[in-house]
Amino acid sequence: MARPDKVAAVAELKEKFSSAGATVLTEYRGLSVSALKDLRRSLGSDATYAVAKNTLTRIAAKEAGIEGLDDQLVGPTALAFINGDVASVAKGLKNFAKDNPLLVIKGGVMDGNVLDADQVKKLADLESREVLLAKLAGGLKANLTKAAVVFNALPSKAARGLGALQEKAAADPSVIGGAGEASDQEPKTTETPEASAAQDNTNE
């Protein structure tokens, strides 16, 4: 029968695997306690970094529906369960490993798919959520600025058009009134020879 503490540990790991947006497996052999504290601090609230036994991790992963981690569960293993920005945490682990070669990225899991070490490092090369949002906000701001310039230009163009029309009207009133005056005049008719002859007969 399994010990209650192991059952509880497996249940906790399973829940973390299931709820995490991604999980990165690392080897921490030789890292000091202070170095591990620094690593946890650098990851911030976006990830939970925990040491776990390979046997319990393997069971928990399978219960969470994750297959294919056996090759990564060799040697001392610590897992970074990411609940925030995946790219940011992956970048933090990659940078920490550069400064502390004793930390080795083994691989990971994302969306139920097992990743190798290179794939995890590629995640670190992606732009973080904050950077993407900043770029999006910058793009929207630029578009709004362009729209504002266009809308502000419309009234001024109309005003310039009216001003030009007023100047023309002052110089030549027919620009505005010509059409109206023409409409008040009676239309001229042209008499045909037959009509003239008929008029002459009547007069006789």
Swiss-Prot record:
Pfam families recorded: Ribosomal_L10
Q: Where is this region: Disordered?
A: 170-204
Composition-biased stretches, type Polar residues, lie in 192-204
Q: Which UniProt keywords apply?
A: Ribonucleoprotein, Ribosomal protein, RNA-binding, rRNA-binding
Extent of the signal sequence? none
- CDD domains xrefs: Ribosomal_L10 (cd05797)
Q: Note the Gene3D superfamilies from the entry.
A: 3.30.70.1730, 6.10.250.290
Which superkingdom does the taxonomy of this entry point to? Answer: Bacteria
One GO MF term on file is: large ribosomal subunit rRNA binding
Question: Can you list the GO cellular component terms from the UniProt entry?
Answer: large ribosomal subunit
Show the SUPFAM superfamilies listed in the entry.
Ribosomal protein L10-like (SSF160369)
Q: Which GO terms describe its biological process?
A: translation
Q: What does this protein do?
A: Forms part of the ribosomal stalk, playing a central role in the interaction of the ribosome with GTP-bound translation factors.
Q: Which NCBIfam families match?
A: PRK00099.1-1
Q: Which family does it belong to?
A: Belongs to the universal ribosomal protein uL10 family.
Subunit text: Part of the ribosomal stalk of the 50S ribosomal subunit. The N-terminus interacts with L11 and the large rRNA to form the base of the stalk. The C-terminus forms an elongated spine to which L12 dimers bind in a sequential fashion forming a multimeric L10(L12)X complex.
| Name this polypeptide is given | Large ribosomal subunit protein uL10
| Lineage of the organism | Bacteria, Bacillati, Actinomycetota, Actinomycetes, Propionibacteriales
